[in-house]
Every structure is written in C-alpha cells, then in structure tokens.
Amino acid sequence: MADTHTQRPRPVALLILDGYGQNDDTEYNAVYSARTPVMDALKQRYPSTLLHTDGKYVGLPDGQMGNSEVGHMNLGAGRIVYQDFTRITKAIEDNELASNPVLTAPIDAAVAAGRAVHLLGLLSPGGVHSHEDHILAVAALAAERGAKHVYLHAFLDGRDTAPKSARASLERANARLAELFGADNAYVASIVGRYYAMDRDNRWDRVEQAYRVIVEGEGSQVATSAEAGLDAAYERGETDEFVAATSIRPHGEPVRMADGDAALFLNFRADRARELTRAFVEDDFSGFTRQARPKLAHEGLVMLTEYAADIPAPVAFPPTDLVNTLGETVAKRGLKQLRIAETEKYAHVTFFFSGGREDEFEGEHRELIPSPQDVKTYDEKPEMSAYELTDKLVAAIDAGTYDLIVCNYANGDMVGHSGNFDAAVKAIEAVDDCLGRVIEAIERAGGECLVTADHGNAEQMVHPETGNPQTAHTTFQVPLIYVTPRQGATLADDGSLCDLAPTLLTMMHEPVPEEMTGRVLIGNT
C-alpha cells in the first residue's frame, strides 16, 4: 500500500457509540431488543469483532468496569493509559515507593528531627477516591525510613462502600500500625466523615471541622479509640459518611500537628481532596480562620496525585504526559481533524481523547452540539441531540475538509444510566437511524471508518442477581466494525481500545509513532 496522502481514504472516521456493549443474554438487553437494521447490515457486510474496555485492558484494576473518561483516553492514546489507582498500586507491588523522593523526603526530614508522620486520607476499600492499601503501604514506608510516631487521620466513607462498614478498615489500620510501630506510638488519631473532610462545594464550615481535628486535635467528639468513636457515632445516628470530627485520645491527650512533622494526603482522586489541601498550604487561604498552621517538614503537605495545578504542594505521582496521541500525531503530519459530540460527551472527544489536553491541536476543529435542556433526565428524550449532531457530521463529511473525524453518540450511555429499559431501546434505535446516514456519507466520500464503543451500558438494563434496574456501566465487550471498500480486509480478535489509534493511522496510510504500543487490528486475507 503506497504511503501517499493522495491515495489514502478521506475521511477516516471513528464513530463511538457510547454505552453500546455486546451481551449474549437477551433479557433486558436494550441493544438486542432495539431495531438496528444499520448495525445488523454493517456486521454482515464488513469485518467485525469485539473489543475489551474494562480492567487491565484500559489501565484499571482487573474486573473494574470501564468508563467514558478512561475509554476515550485509551482510544486517543494508542497505548494502555494506567489510571492513578493502578499506577500507585503497581508502584507498591514493584517496591517503588522507597525510590519516590516526594514521599521519602518529608518522612526522612521528620525522622531526622525526631518528629511525627501524619497520614491523611479516605480509609476505605472503595477504590474510587482512595484505597486503604495505599495508606497502609505508606505507613510501612515510614517504618522502613525509621519513623517512630505515625498518626493516621481517617476519613470515613459510607458512600462508595456500605453506610456502616468503617469498623473493619479501622481495626485493620490500627492492627497494622501497632505491628509496625507499637500500639502506643502509632494509631488512628482522628476520625471524621467524608462529608466534612472531602467537601467540594466550598462549604468551608465542614472543612474547618476536619482541619481542626487533624491539626489541633480538637473535634466535637472525643474517644479513647477509633472503634469506640465509631460506636458512639452510630449511637448518635450517624453513618460513616457523616461521622462528626472525633479526636482519638488513648492516653488522654490529643494528637496535634507540630512544626517539623511530616504530612501526606493519600487520596488519589482530586476533586474531593482540593479544599482541605488548600487549607493546609495556601498562604492567602480565606475559607476559614486557621487557629494553627504548623510549618510541616520539607516542602509541606504532600499530595499523592495532583489535586489542582495551582495548589503549591509537592506531588508524589504527577500526571502522565502523553506524547504523540492520535490527535497530536495527525496535527504533526499537517492533516485536519474534527472532534464532534453533544455536550454530555464533548469533553470526552476533546480533552480526554487528547490525553488531558485542553487546547486544540493545529488543524483541529471542534463542533459542540448542545444536549437537550428541556428535560430533567434523558429517558424523557432518548434521541437526545443525535439528529442535530448527524446533520452537522454529514455536512462536514460532504464538505471534504477533514482527514480524521472523531464522533461520539451519547445516547446508549446517558439513557442507559436512567435505568429505563424502554427509553434505552429508543435511544439505540435513534443512534442506528443516524448511523445509517453517516455511513452513507462516508461511503459517498470514499472514506473509511471504525464503528465501536467506549464501554457497555444499555445491553444490561436490569441487574441479573438483584432484579433491580442497572444504571451502571458493564464489563461486556463492545463491537468493532471496519467499514471499508477494500476486498479481503480483516480485523484481528482480542483487541482493546488502545489498538484503535494505531489502526486509524494505518487506515490513513500514516506511520505509527513508537509511543503507541497498541496493535494494528486491520489486515488482509
């Protein structure tokens, strides 16, 4: 195949049918139940296969369902993009924490000064904002570095976990700390519900209660142990999420942060860690009056990941810089690209598909179609803005301006989240209707395209075990169809989302950059 711009198909398109998975169980399967003559015909006429979108295939823990952010990041990167949860877990498994100077420097400084180490975070196995395994791994790191006094300030979950499930985590943490340092030298020194410690709506009165119990050892409640404090909270009618700030005082005196102490915030998700972090590190902080603000060891409070670019605190696991994503590669080759979606998925075909880049690349155009504003939930309008999007997309194809087009149809996912089976069927049918027009335009232009999804959703609308509506994503594979006029074209099986960027470049007769470790899935018989 000659590598010339004149001979390649134009445009090459990636059509992402969000939330459109393949489930062999046909019951409460909106994808199966919908009338989809276009998809049915495409599968008959063109090469097709299934793709993995979950767990290790997209940089998540095994078995973890994919999501739109992760899916589009992998689609655009052309390599598995390890998510923060997985990156940190892998660093622990590979014994790499000890070689991370952002973690070791403040601990070493505190040890040298004879000061304490404080660990802050959501003590939970939920895996959404944090994981207790990460917290206990850093405690073990502190022990290896010679720390004598380590205090854990535990935020309680009850939201990504059962409402009253914190006891097991507290008992496990105290047992491990006692094993590492001795029970008198290390323990859970405060507990507070995430409602207070992890606010994200500038409710500073809540954050202040968490800050004061961590820094000053002053809470509205006092207990001799974390477990006793939790029992008292339950007796007050509080669940884990709402546990009042409780100072734990096994020896009668509170734990207070002091100058020279080390402090590490061990949540990995940013949005609910920002406010408390700002209270620790910002000189001009105005959320509430800080009665105490100790000068912490080394460069101050450590963030496990970057909670915000403007927070002046060291980051143990900074954002990965994705070089030569599909969008960047196409731009470097002097080609034109279109990203198009309705509001609900606009960030996914732009920011996430570009590897976390806000700005357009050279030669990139973005088309935003507003999602419906006249309904509370999209099951009231399952077609959403698919027809308006299709009008714009077909016009763009007919204009012949673009070499690469990336489009997302949001319906299967957004209506799937409603749990409304009948509406999800209508959503899938609307997408199929639109898909027919788009494929006709691509064929008319002499182009090629891949039709796929970022993850499943609408193919399982009722949970098979509980019988309740299922509103979450699934771990089912998703279809991949290669629409091409080439005779004898094939698609390899057992692919993942990261394989599509190198595949698209190959369709465009463009070389694949070495950073893209995904496989090219197209071939010939």
From Swiss-Prot:
Q: Which cofactor does it need?
A: Mn(2+)
Q: Gene3D superfamilies, per this entry?
A: Alkaline Phosphatase, subunit A (3.40.720.10), BPG-independent phosphoglycerate mutase, domain B (3.40.1450.10)
MF terms in GO: manganese ion binding; phosphoglycerate mutase activity
EC number, UniProt record: 5.4.2.12
Q: Which residues form the active site?
A: S68 (phosphoserine intermediate)
The entry marks the following residues as binding Mn(2+) 1, namely: D413, H417, H473
Sites where the protein binds Mn(2+) 2: D18, S68, D454, H455
Residues recorded as binding substrate, renumbered to this chain, are H129, R159, D160, R194, R200, R269, A270, D271, R272, K345
Q: Which GO terms describe its cellular component?
A: cytosol
Top enzyme class, one word, equals: isomerase
Record carries keyword Metal-binding: yes
Catalyses:
(2R)-2-phosphoglycerate = (2R)-3-phosphoglycerate
Q: Which UniProt keywords apply?
A: Glycolysis, Isomerase, Manganese, Metal-binding
UniProt remark on cofactor binding: Binds 2 manganese ions per subunit.
Question: Which GO biological process annotations does it have?
Answer: glucose catabolic process; glycolytic process
Record pathway: Carbohydrate degradation; glycolysis; pyruvate from D-glyceraldehyde 3-phosphate: step 3/5
- Family indicated by similarity: Belongs to the BPG-independent phosphoglycerate mutase family.
Query: What is known about its subunit structure?
Result: Monomer.
Please describe what this protein does: Catalyzes the interconversion of 2-phosphoglycerate and 3-phosphoglycerate.
Name this protein carries in UniProt: 2,3-bisphosphoglycerate-independent phosphoglycerate mutase
Could you tell me which species this protein originates from?
Chromohalobacter salexigens (strain ATCC BAA-138 / DSM 3043 / CIP 106854 / NCIMB 13768 / 1H11)
